[in-house]
Amino acid sequence: MSTHALQNFELHVLVAMLRERGETYSVPLVLELEKRIGRPVSQAAVFIALKRLEQKGLVTSRLDEPASGRVRRYFKVTKQGLAAVEAQRVEHVRLWRGLERVLRVHKA
């Protein structure tokens, strides 16, 4: 697997996409991200992250032209995207391992 450096927000978008299970577009991702990270998220920021992820080969997209209404671009996580999320998860687990005691001491 080619390793691509993921920006923090790109990782958030990939994780939100995995929670949506399958293809999704930017609006549900905005709602999921706002719910999970507890702050406002712009649709433009999500779309920019999606385009970057697509350029890295971590997501694919397709246009859906409905009989009526707006055209939507649907995105889907690729196998490489799934591998990138798993690699980031493993890295974060290693990074945080052993800090529970330190954080409890500072919390007390």
Pin down the residues of each PLM region.
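Short beta-strand/turn micro-motifs at beta-sheet edges
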Residues: 1-4, 62-64
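N-terminal helix-turn-helix DNA-binding core of bacterial DNA-binding proteins
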Residues: 2-45
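Short, contiguous hydrophobic alpha-helices characteristic of membrane insertion segments
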Residues: 2-3, 50, 106-108
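Basic amphipathic alpha-helical segments that dock to polyanions
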Residues: 46-53
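Beta-hairpin "wing" of winged helix-turn-helix
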Residues: 54-71, 76
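Accessory beta->alpha helical hairpin/"wing" motif in late/C-terminal subdomains of nucleic-acid enzymes
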Residues: 77-81
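Amphipathic alpha-helical dimerization/coiled-coil segments
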Residues: 83-108
